[in-house]
C-alpha cells in the first residue's frame, strides 16, 4: 500500500484520511532520513490502519524511532475514548516469529495445509496442538494468521532431524524440545526436538452436495427440521465437519449398531470407556448428545461373545441423527445378518475423507500395531457374517482394501476359522505398508491404539532412513520398538528426535508466516515438529568516571555474574508459578517488601511501580509458568545493563533536580516482563480474535485485533496487562538490588554511601487510562504506547513530587555503544501526543540482518578500542545489537526536542555493557 504524506514542517508529517475507513489522520514525527526508513517497511501503513479503529482521538501517531511492528507500528501512540474506544494487545507490545512458506500445518482431520494457504481457509480449520500440561495431542481453532516480508539479505534456518523431517523458518521461531522452547537459530546438532509422527495427506477441495433434503422427503418433517437446525442437511463436501462425520461412520461400521430399541430407532456404539468418550466429543461437535451406559456384556452385533463381563455403550437417542447415518450408508440391524458395502460417497471422496473413515473403522475393528523385536507384525481387520453373506463380506473387505491401496498400502485377504458363520481377515502386510498406515491413516478414538501407532510411525521412519543410508539391514544394536518407545516416546504419541543438521539458507521466497491458536498450549505442528512488555530504569551514583574506569571490567563482570541474563535466563529467586500472584498485584512494592530495595525507590517509579487493578486471575497458568522462573532476570536481545557516564548537560536546572552532573557514573537497566508479558499478549490476541466479530469492529489488518475497552474481554485484558507491567517493575526492582550489591562488591562501600538512588523508571510498552484535552474538552482515554514513553509536563499530579516543578524524567536508551539521553516531559507533548514521546533509537536492521552484516567478536573489539567493555552471553547477541543496526539516537531525540514533545536534559555515553 502506498501511503500519502503531507509535510507540515521540517519534522512533522501528516497521513491524510486517504482511506474512507480512517477516522482521524496520521501524525508522523521524523526528519527526512528517519522517514525514508519508515517508508521501507509497513510503518506508515500500520499507522493508517490504527487510524481506522473506533473511538480514536486526534491522530494515529508515529514517533521518530518508529518501525514496523505487529499491528501497531513500534514507536506508535494512539488514544481511544474509554467508553467508545478499543484496546489492542498489538498496540501495547507483541512480536511474531515465522516459518517458511510450504511448511505443512497438520489439522484435526489428518490432512495438512501449507501455512501460506491458511489465511484463506483458517476459519474452517482446527489444527493439531501439543497439550504440554496434560501430555497429549489436542485440537484448536486458528486464532490468526500472520505474515511478514523476508528482509533483504535475511537468512532462514533449516533444521533436519534424524528421520529426515525438515523445518525452515526465521532464526527466532520457537521449537519445542524436551527442555522447553528453543529458537530455531539456537538449535545445534545432537539436540532433541519434539515431533508428532503422523503425516496425514494433502488437503483436496471438493464442491457439491453429498446428501440433500430430498433424501428425507418420506420421513417425519421433524427429522428434516432437526437436521437443518444442526446444519447437517444439505451436507456438502466443503462442510468443515465432513472429516468428523466420516470417522464416526467408519467407527459405526465396526462397533456401531443402528436398530430399534424399545420401539424407537437408536444408534449405539460399543467399546472401551476411553474410546467412547473420545467418540462422544466428536458427536458433540456435531451438536448430537449421547449418553454412556455400563451394562452386562452380551454377544455384540459383530457376533463376538464377550462373556459375562461389564461393557460400556454410548447411546444416541436422536432418531434424526440415526436416519442421517443410515442415509450415509450405515446398515440398519445386526450387521452380521445384513449385506452392505463401503458407501459410494466414501469411495468417491477426497483422500483425506477416506483417511478419516478408515481411521474410525480400524479404531473399532482393527488390531493394535505390535512388534517382534524391531519388526512390525501385520495389522488385521477382522469381520464376521452369517454363512449366506460370505460373498458380501469379501466384497466389503475388498472395498476397504481398495481404499488402503490408494494410500500405497498392500493387503492380503483370507478366511479364518470361526465357530459361527464365516470370518475373514484383511491384513496389512510388509513394513512399508504398515509404516504408511500408521503415518497417514492411523487410528482415531482409541487412545491406546493411536499412541502406539504414532510412536510406531516414528520408529519405522527412523529405521527406514537408517537402512536407506547404510544400504543394509539395521544392526544388532538398533533398539527394539519397546526400547525406543520407552526412551523417546511421550504421552499423546509425541516423540523426541535428534537434530542431525542445522543450516543457514537463503530464502527462495519473499514472506514468512505464523499462526496463532486459541488453545492454551499456543503451539501447532509444522512438518511434524511442534513449534510456537518493557521499560527502562536509571540509577545514579556519586562516583565519577575517574573512580570507575580502572575497575570497569571487574564491575561489568560482577554485574554479569549477579544479574541472570540470556535467552531463557532464569532468576536467582525460585518461586513456583502458584506463588507469583502477589508479584502481579504489588509489583515493585512486593520486591521492596521482600528486601529488594529501599522504600524511597517506589517514589521514583512510574505508577509507583504498581498499577492498581491488576488481576492475577486474568493471567493464564501458562503465562505464570513462563514468568515465575524468569523473575529477577535480564533476558536477551536489546535488554541490557549499561554503566554510563554523563558527558553533557543541556539543562543544568532540571539536571540538578534529577541529581545528575557531568562526569557522573550512572547505570541504565532495560528489561521487562519477560515470557509472562509475551504470553499475556498471545493469550488475549486469541481471545479477542474470537470476540471481534461479536462486536463488529472494523478489522483493517489481521494483526490489528481489538475489542471495546469496556467489554468483558477488554477489561480482563487490561487487568492482565497491568499484572504483566507489575511483574516488569518487580523484575527491574530486583535487578536494581543486585546492581547495588555488585557496586558494593567492587567498591567496598554501601550502596547508600555510593548515592545509588533511582532517578526514574518508565514503561514503554503499556496502556494507560489518562485524562487529556481534545478539542477544548477534558476526556478520559486509554492511551496505547507501543515503543513510546510517557512524557508528562511540569505540574502534572502523576509525577513524583520531587520532579513536579520540572517535568517527568524521560529515559531514552541508545543502541549498544552509542549515547543515551535523559529528557523531560513538556506541555507540547500533552497538547500534541497525549503526553508521549519516543523510547529509543529504533531498529533499521532486523536481528537476522545484523548477524549477517556484523561479527560479534569484531564489534566487541571495536567497542573495547573506544573504551567500552562488553560482556555478553553470546557473540551473536553482540552482532544483533551492533550500533549500526539502529537509527541514530541523536537524530531521534533531536526531532522530539525540535517538536517540543520533550526537552533535552542530559546525555550519557557507555563505558561498560552487560547483555543477555
Swiss-Prot record:
<dbReference type="GO" id="GO:0005525">
    <property type="term" value="F:GTP binding"/>
</dbReference>
<dbReference type="InterPro" id="IPR003586">
    <property type="entry name" value="Hint_dom_C"/>
</dbReference>
<keyword id="KW-0819">tRNA processing</keyword>
<keyword id="KW-0436">Ligase</keyword>
<feature type="binding site">
    <location>
        <begin position="839"/>
        <end position="842"/>
    </location>
    <ligand>
        <name>GMP</name>
    </ligand>
</feature>
<comment type="function">
    <text>Essential for tRNA splicing and maturation. Acts by directly joining spliced tRNA halves to mature-sized tRNAs. Joins RNA with 2',3'-cyclic-phosphate or 3'-phosphate ends to RNA with 5'-hydroxy ends.</text>
</comment>
<keyword id="KW-0255">Endonuclease</keyword>
<feature type="binding site">
    <location>
        <position position="764"/>
    </location>
    <ligand>
        <name>Mn(2+) 2</name>
    </ligand>
</feature>
<comment type="similarity">
    <text>Belongs to the RtcB family.</text>
</comment>
<dbReference type="InterPro" id="IPR004860">
    <property type="entry name" value="LAGLIDADG_dom"/>
</dbReference>
<keyword id="KW-0404">Intron homing</keyword>
<keyword id="KW-0464">Manganese</keyword>
<dbReference type="InterPro" id="IPR004042">
    <property type="entry name" value="Intein_endonuc_central"/>
</dbReference>
<dbReference type="InterPro" id="IPR036844">
    <property type="entry name" value="Hint_dom_sf"/>
</dbReference>
<dbReference type="Pfam" id="PF14528">
    <property type="entry name" value="LAGLIDADG_3"/>
</dbReference>
<keyword id="KW-0540">Nuclease</keyword>
<feature type="binding site">
    <location>
        <begin position="813"/>
        <end position="816"/>
    </location>
    <ligand>
        <name>GMP</name>
    </ligand>
</feature>
<keyword id="KW-0479">Metal-binding</keyword>
<keyword id="KW-0238">DNA-binding</keyword>
<feature type="active site" description="GMP-histidine intermediate">
    <location>
        <position position="839"/>
    </location>
</feature>
<dbReference type="GO" id="GO:0003972">
    <property type="term" value="F:RNA ligase (ATP) activity"/>
</dbReference>
<feature type="binding site">
    <location>
        <position position="670"/>
    </location>
    <ligand>
        <name>Mn(2+) 2</name>
    </ligand>
</feature>
<dbReference type="InterPro" id="IPR006141">
    <property type="entry name" value="Intein_N"/>
</dbReference>
<dbReference type="GO" id="GO:0003677">
    <property type="term" value="F:DNA binding"/>
</dbReference>
<feature type="domain" description="DOD-type homing endonuclease">
    <location>
        <begin position="248"/>
        <end position="409"/>
    </location>
</feature>
<feature type="binding site">
    <location>
        <begin position="764"/>
        <end position="765"/>
    </location>
    <ligand>
        <name>GMP</name>
    </ligand>
</feature>
<dbReference type="GO" id="GO:0006314">
    <property type="term" value="P:intron homing"/>
</dbReference>
<keyword id="KW-0342">GTP-binding</keyword>
<feature type="binding site">
    <location>
        <position position="820"/>
    </location>
    <ligand>
        <name>GMP</name>
    </ligand>
</feature>
<comment type="subunit">
    <text>Monomer.</text>
</comment>
<keyword id="KW-0378">Hydrolase</keyword>
<keyword id="KW-0651">Protein splicing</keyword>
<dbReference type="Pfam" id="PF01139">
    <property type="entry name" value="RtcB"/>
</dbReference>
<feature type="binding site">
    <location>
        <position position="639"/>
    </location>
    <ligand>
        <name>Mn(2+) 1</name>
    </ligand>
</feature>
<dbReference type="GO" id="GO:0004519">
    <property type="term" value="F:endonuclease activity"/>
</dbReference>
<dbReference type="InterPro" id="IPR036025">
    <property type="entry name" value="RtcB-like_sf"/>
</dbReference>
<keyword id="KW-0068">Autocatalytic cleavage</keyword>
<feature type="binding site">
    <location>
        <position position="95"/>
    </location>
    <ligand>
        <name>Mn(2+) 1</name>
    </ligand>
</feature>
<feature type="binding site">
    <location>
        <begin position="638"/>
        <end position="642"/>
    </location>
    <ligand>
        <name>GMP</name>
    </ligand>
</feature>
<feature type="binding site">
    <location>
        <position position="534"/>
    </location>
    <ligand>
        <name>Mn(2+) 2</name>
    </ligand>
</feature>
<dbReference type="InterPro" id="IPR001233">
    <property type="entry name" value="RtcB"/>
</dbReference>
<protein>
    <recommendedName>
        <fullName>tRNA-splicing ligase RtcB</fullName>
        <ecNumber>6.5.1.8</ecNumber>
        <ecNumber>3.1.-.-</ecNumber>
    </recommendedName>
</protein>
Amino acid at each position: 500500500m502506498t501511503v500519502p504524506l503531507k509535510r507540515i514542517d521540517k519534522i512533522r508529517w501528516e497521513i491524510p484520511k486517504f482511506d474512507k475507513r480512517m477516522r482521524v489522520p496520521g501524525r508522523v514525527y521524523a526528519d527526512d532520513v528517519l522517514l525514508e526508513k519508515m517508508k521501507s517497511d509497513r510503518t506508515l501503513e500500520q499507522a493508517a490502519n490504527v487510524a481506522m479503529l473506533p473511538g480514536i482521538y486526534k491522530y494515529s501517531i508515529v514517533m521518530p524511532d518508529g518501525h514496523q511492528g505487529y499491528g501497531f507500528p513500534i514507536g506508535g501512540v494512539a488514544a481511544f475514548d474509554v467508553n467508545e474506544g478499543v484496546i489492542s494487545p498489538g498496540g501495547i507490545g507483541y512480536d511474531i516469529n515465522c516459518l517458511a512458506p510450504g511448511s505443512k500445518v497438520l489439522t484435526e482431520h489428518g490432512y495438512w495445509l501449507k501455512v501460506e494457504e491458511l489465511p484463506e481457509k483458517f476459519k474452517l480449520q482446527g489444527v493439531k496442538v501439543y497439550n504440554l500440561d496434560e501430555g497429549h495431542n489436542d485440537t484448536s481453532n486458528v486464532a490468526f494468521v500472520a505474515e511478514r516480508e523476508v528482509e533483504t539479505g535475511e537468512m532462514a534456518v533449516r533444521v533436519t532431524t534424524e528421520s529426515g523431517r525438515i523445518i525452515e523458518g526465521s532464526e527466532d521461531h520457537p521449537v519445542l524440545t524436551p527442555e522447553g522452547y528453543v529458537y530455531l537459530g539456537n538449535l545445534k546438532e545432537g539436540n532433541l526436538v519434539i515431533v508428532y509422527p503422523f503425516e496425514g495427506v494433502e488437503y483436496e477441495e471438493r464442491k457439491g452436495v453429498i446428501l440433500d433434503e430430498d433424501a428425507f422427503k418420506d420421513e417425519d418433517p421433524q427429522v428434516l427440521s432437526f437436521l437443518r437446525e444442526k446444519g447437517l442437511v444439505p451436507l456438502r463436501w466443503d462442510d468443515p465437519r465432513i472429516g468428523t462425520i466420516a470417522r464416526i461412520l467408519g467407527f459405526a461400521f465396526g462397533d456401531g449398531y443402528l436398530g430399534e430399541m424399545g420401539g424407537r430407532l437408536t444408534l449405539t456404539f460399543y467399546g472401551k470407556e476411553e474410546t467412547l468418550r473420545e467418540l462422544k466429543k466428536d458427536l458433540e461437535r456435531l451438536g448430537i448428545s449421547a449418553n454412556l451406559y455400563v451394562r452386562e456384556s452380551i454377544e455384540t452385533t459383530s457376533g463376538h461373545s464377550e462373556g459375562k463381563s461389564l461393557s460400556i455403550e454410548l447411546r444416541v437417542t436422536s432418531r434424526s441423527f440415526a436416519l442421517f447415518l443410515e442415509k450415509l450408508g450405515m446398515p440398519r440391524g445386526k450387521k452380521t445378518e445384513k449385506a452392505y458395502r463401503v458407501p459410494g460417497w466414501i469411495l468417491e471422496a477426497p483422500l483425506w475423507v477416506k483417511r478419516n473413515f478408515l481411521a474410525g473403522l480400524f479404531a473399532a475393528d482393527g488390531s493394535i500395531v505390535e512388534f517382534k523385536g524391531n519388526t512390525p507384525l501385520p495389522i488385521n481387520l477382522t469381520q464376521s457374517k452369517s454363512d449366506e453373506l460370505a460373498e458380501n463380506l469379501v466384497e466389503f473387505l475388498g472395498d476397504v482394501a481398495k481404499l488402503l491401496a490408494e494410500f500405497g498400502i498392500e493387503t492380503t485377504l483370507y478366511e479364518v476359522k470361526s465357530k459361527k458363520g464365516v470370518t475373514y481377515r484383511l491384513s496389512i502386510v510388509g513394513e512399508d505398508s504398515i509404516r504408511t498406515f500408521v503415518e497417514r491413516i492411523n487410528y482415531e478414538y482409541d487412545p491406546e491404539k493411536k499412541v502406539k501407532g504414532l510412536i510406531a510411525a516414528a520408529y519405522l521412519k527412523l529405521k527406514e532412513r537408517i537402512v536407506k543410508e547404510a544400504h543394509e539391514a539395521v544392526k544388532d544394536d538398533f533398539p527394539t520398538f519397546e526400547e525406543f518407545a520407552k526412551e523417546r516416546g511421550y504421552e499423546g504419541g509425541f516423540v523426541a528426535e535428534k537434530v542431525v543438521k542445522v543450516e543457514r539458507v537463503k530464502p527462495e521466497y519473499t514472506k514468512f508466516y505464523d499462526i496463532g491458536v486459541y488453545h492454551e498450549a499456543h503451539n501447532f505442528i509444522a512438518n511434524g515438529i511442534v513449534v510456537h512488555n518493557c521499560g527502562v530504569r536509571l540509577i545514579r551514583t556519586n562516583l565519577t568516571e575517574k573512580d570507575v574506569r580502572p575497575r570497569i571490567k571487574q564491575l561489568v563482570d560482577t554485574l554479569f555474574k549477579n544479574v541472570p541474563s540470556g535467552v531463557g535466563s532464569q532468576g536467582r529467586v525460585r518461586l513456583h508459578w502458584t506463588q507469583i500472584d502477589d508479584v502481579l498485584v504489588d509489583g515493585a512494592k512486593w520486591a521492596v517488601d521482600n528486601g529488594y530495595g529501599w522504600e524511597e525507590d517506589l517514589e521514583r517509579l512510574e505508577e509507583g511501580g504498581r498499577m492498581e487493578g491488576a488481576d492475577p486471575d486474568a493471567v493464564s497458568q501458562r503465562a505464570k509458568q513462563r514468568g515465575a522462573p524468569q523473575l529477577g532476570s535480564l533476558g536477551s536481545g536489546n535488554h541490557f545493563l549499561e554503566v554510563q557516564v554523563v558527558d553533557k548537560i543541556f539543562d543544568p536546572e532540571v539536571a540538578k533536580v534529577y541529581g545528575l552532573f557531568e562526569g557522573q557514573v550512572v547505570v541504565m537497566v532495560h528489561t521487562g516482563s519477560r515470557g509472562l508479558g509475551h504470553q499475556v499478549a498471545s493469550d488475549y490476541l486469541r481471545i479477542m480474535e474470537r470476540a471481534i466479530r461479536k462486536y463488529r469492529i472494523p478489522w483493517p489488518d489481521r494483526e490489528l485485533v481489538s475489542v471495546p475497552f469496556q467489554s468483558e474481554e477488554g477489561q480482563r485484558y487490561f487487568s492482565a496487562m497491568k499484572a504483566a507491567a507489575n511483574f516488569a517493575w518487580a523484575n527491574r526492582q530486583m535487578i536494581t538490588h543486585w546492581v547495588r550489591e555488585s557496586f558494593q562488591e567492587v567498591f567496598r562501600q554501601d550502596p547508600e554511601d555510593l548515592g545509588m538512588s533511582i532517578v526514574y523508571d518508565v514503561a514503554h510498552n503499556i496502556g494507560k487510562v489518562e485524562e487529556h484535552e481534545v478539542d477544548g474538552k477534558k476526556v478520559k482515554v486509554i492511551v496505547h504506547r507501543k515503543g513510546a514513553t510517557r512524557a508528562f509536563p511540569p505540574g502534572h499530579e502523576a509525577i513524583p513530587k520531587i520532579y513536579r516543578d520540572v517535568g517527568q524524567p524521560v529515559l531514552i536508551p541508545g543502541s549498544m555503544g552509542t549515547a543515551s539521553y535523559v529528557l523531560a516531559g513538556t506541555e507540547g507533548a500533552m497538547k500534541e501526543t497525549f503526553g508521549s514521546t519516543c523510547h529509543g533509537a529504533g531498529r533499521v536492521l532486523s536481528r537476522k540482518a545484523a548477524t549477517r552484516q556484523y561479527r560479534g567478536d569484531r564489534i566487541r573489539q571495536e567497542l573495547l578500542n573506544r573504551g567500552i567493555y562488553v560482556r555478553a552471553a553470546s557473540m551473536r547477541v553482540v552482532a544483533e545489537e551492533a550500533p549500526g543496526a539502529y537509527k541514530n539516537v541523536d537524530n531521534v531525540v533531536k526531532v522530539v526536542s525540535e517538536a517540543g514533545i520533550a526537552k533535552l536534559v542530559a546525555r550519557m555515553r557507555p563505558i561498560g555493557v552487560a547483555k543477555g
